[in-house]
């Protein structure tokens, strides 16, 4: 079904980039997963816990092994008494989760004799999610799957949540490295401005190919080798720390132009706040000459640069806050008004 509502929200907690299945994952550690779950249980009433993409790394492992790596954490959050809803917004590394749900929707229509094709964009919402099967019997938390973004009304202003991989389309220095180069040429001939559907169609072949690779383990190594080539040129063209994605490891201020380009396509050109992940660089900022606050959720993977924090999440209520998990609990890193 289509997702076009903007409900009033209480506290929202957003976390992303756990990458269950990848060798850099951290929350597969039972003690760390339990400690984070305990901290979340003490954050007061939570209207929604948003899993903002790359929960699973389906470019490295197939679905069941990846979920198995995250089972302890997923069971933990599903059992939180203070969380009302869990919303799963897939990213690029778990894009296949959305595609599976979309195909099931199409197949259900065909079984009813309905041969119409559901609208792919701007967003689709499904009750339940593949991970809801790990909820303990009797759990009151509800699960939903939404792709590629959700909006919520917080403190009277719109807040947009999305993983962030669509921002890669707007990177001026290295967008050609994937299918985006061809897409730009096609779009330029057909119309002056790309749509969200165009960007998704450009992203689809790449994500699809990478999600198939884990079924043939030898292909995973080839895919990672392809990325290493991209990274080499990215370091020459833009930054010394670029990894895994066009925007991976970029700072929030380096993403402002991409965010400006994407927001109108989401139908929310000037929200109060834009929350995303994808880059593995936690932070909070404000786009110059606007009232748009930007927050990045960071990641739960090992960082090559010890100076880059991980174990971070974002909380949105009356304002937006960035927290980090420490040995003593939740440490407030930054906050900004919406």
Residue ranges of model-derived segments:
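Active-site-proximal loop/helix segment associated with metal-binding centers of metalloenzymes
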Residues: 159-258
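Alpha-helix-centered segments that form part of catalytic cores
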Residues: 128-147, 236-269
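Conserved beta-sheet core of the metallophosphoesterase superfamily
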Residues: 107-119, 147, 155-160, 165-188, ...
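Low-complexity, flexible helical/coil segments
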Residues: 48-54, 84-89, 122-128, 188, ...
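Core catalytic region of metal-dependent phosphoesterases/phosphodiesterases
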Residues: 2-15, 20-153
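Acidic, His/Gly-rich catalytic cores of divalent-metal-dependent hydrolytic chemistry
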Residues: 210-234, 286-338
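A signal for specific C-terminal beta-sheet/loop modules enriched in small/flexible residues
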Residues: 4-12, 32-36, 73, 177-184, ...
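N-terminal short leaders/motifs
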Residues: 38, 83-84, 90-92, 228-229, ...
């Amino acid at each position: 079904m289509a997702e076009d509502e903007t409900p009033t929200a209480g506290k929202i907690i957003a976390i992303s980039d756990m990458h269950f299945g990848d060798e850099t994952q951290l929350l597969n550690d039972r003690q760390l997963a339990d400690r984070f779950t305990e901290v979340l249980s003490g954050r007061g009433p939570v209207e929604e816990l948003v899993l903002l993409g790359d929960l699973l790394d389906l470019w490295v492992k197939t679905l069941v092994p990846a979920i198995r790596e995250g089972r302890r954490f997923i069971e933990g959050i599903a059992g939180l008494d203070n969380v009302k809803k869990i919303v799963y917004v897939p990213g690029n590394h778990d894009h296949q989760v959305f595609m599976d749900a979309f195909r099931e929707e199409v197949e259900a229509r065909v079984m009813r004799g309905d041969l119409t094709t559901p609208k792919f964009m701007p967003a689709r919402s499904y009750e339940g999610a593949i991970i809801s099967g790990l909820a303990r019997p009797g759990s009151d938390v509800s699960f939903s799957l939404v792709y590629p973004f959700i909006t919520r009304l917080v403190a009277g202003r719109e807040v947009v949540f999305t993983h962030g991989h669509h921002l890669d389309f707007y990177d001026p220095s290295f967008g050609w490295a994937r299918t985006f180069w061809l897409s730009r040429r096609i779009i330029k001939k057909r119309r002056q401005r790309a749509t969200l559907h165009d960007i998704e169609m450009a992203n689809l072949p790449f994500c699809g190919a990478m999600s198939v690779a884990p079924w043939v383990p030898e292909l995973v190594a080839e895919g990672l080798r392809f990325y290493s080539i991209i990274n080499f040129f990215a370091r020459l063209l833009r930054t010394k720390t670029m990894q895994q994605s066009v925007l991976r490891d970029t700072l929030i201020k380096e993403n402002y132009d991409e965010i400006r380009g994407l927001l109108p396509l989401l139908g929310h050109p000037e929200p109060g706040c834009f929350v995303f992940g994808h880059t593995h660089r936690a932070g909070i900022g404000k786009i110059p000459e606007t009232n748009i606050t930007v927050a990045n959720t960071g990641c739960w993977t090992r960082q090559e640069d010890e100076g880059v924090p991980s174990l971070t999440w974002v909380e949105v209520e009356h304002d937006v806050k960035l927290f980090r998990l420490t040995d003593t609990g939740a440490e407030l890193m930054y906050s900004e008004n919406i």
